[in-house]
Amino acid sequence: MRVDGRTNDELRPVHIEPNYLKHPEGSVLISIGDTKVICTASIEDKVPPFMRGGGKGWITAEYAMIPRATEQRNIREASKGKLSGRTMEIQRLIGRALRSVVDLQKLGEKTIWIDCDVIQADGGTRTASITGAFVAMTLALGKMVEEKKLPALPITDFLAATSVGIDGEHGIILDLNYIEDSKAQVDMNIVMTGSGRFVEIQGTGEEATFSYEQLLDLLTVAEKGIHELIARQKEALGSLAEQIMQHCSEGEEAK
């Protein structure tokens, strides 16, 4: 048994609360175990200067942690006057991941701003941010369709992320909490679509190596977890999830 009593391939309890805030076009509070992230999606009728006139939209993300999201208070990065390398890496990861499942041409010259604010951290904050941000973005785009600002959802597939790792005591484990992450011999973050295609694989040996066979096993366990996360996304999205599934089916038939 793991530190919190889970089996090796078991996610922590997942809860996605849609429309968590009243002002953003899309928002959720996602809780994965004791990790909690507020994700919002805001839409602007303009794109960055480098994209003007191209007819395509853009998706960008910001990520932050409140000072007491962790056991010891952290100084706000705004107070330091610059973002850490970790924060910049995570922001880029969230933006890249979401752009992979949106038809930016159909979005038109609009920018979707994703804001992910970690209010409690216990491992897996970047993967929780991606999983929650997808739901917030879908809610925002659904509102645009409802208001007839878009003819249809420009989303091509579902998207979620999780972590996997190798623990010296338990072997391959899914969805690492902070204690497990700090002790893992191998740590990996996986982003996948609903159709099982990889968007990002970030894997590191922590003073250890891992074999090709272990890599395949890690990916298999991650895929299981991501399918379960997408099932939770579908529950939170309701009829919007059905629209995405219909779009995916039409895309398969067109191939």
Curated annotation (Swiss-Prot):
EC number: 2.7.7.56
The keyword Mitochondrion appears for this protein: no
Enzyme class: transferase
Residues holding phosphate: 86, 124-126
InterPro entries: ExoRNase_PH_dom1 (IPR001247), ExoRNase_PH_dom2 (IPR015847), ExoRNase_PH_dom2_sf (IPR036345), PNPase/RNase_PH_dom_sf (IPR027408), Ribosomal_Su5_D2-typ_SF (IPR020568), RNase_PH (IPR050080), RNase_PH_bac-type (IPR002381), RNase_PH_CS (IPR018336)
GO molecular function terms noted in the UniProt entry: 3'-5'-RNA exonuclease activity; tRNA binding; tRNA nucleotidyltransferase activity
GO biological process, one term: tRNA processing
Catalytic activity from the UniProt record: tRNA(n+1) + phosphate = tRNA(n) + a ribonucleoside 5'-diphosphate
Keyword Metal-binding: no
Keyword tags: Nucleotidyltransferase, RNA-binding, rRNA processing, Transferase, tRNA processing, tRNA-binding
CDD domains recorded: RNase_PH_bact
Highest taxon of source: Bacteria
SUPFAM superfamilies tied to this protein: Ribonuclease PH domain 2-like, Ribosomal protein S5 domain 2-like
Gene3D superfamilies: GHMP Kinase, N-terminal domain
PROSITE patterns, A to Z: RIBONUCLEASE_PH (PS01277)
Similarity comment text for this entry: Belongs to the RNase PH family.
Function: Phosphorolytic 3'-5' exoribonuclease that plays an important role in tRNA 3'-end maturation. Removes nucleotide residues following the 3'-CCA terminus of tRNAs; can also add nucleotides to the ends of RNA molecules by using nucleoside diphosphates as substrates, but this may not be physiologically important. Probably plays a role in initiation of 16S rRNA degradation (leading to ribosome degradation) during starvation.
HAMAP family: RNase_PH
Oligomer and partners: Homohexameric ring arranged as a trimer of dimers.
Record-given protein name: Ribonuclease PH
The organism of origin for this protein: Anoxybacillus flavithermus (strain DSM 21510 / WK1)
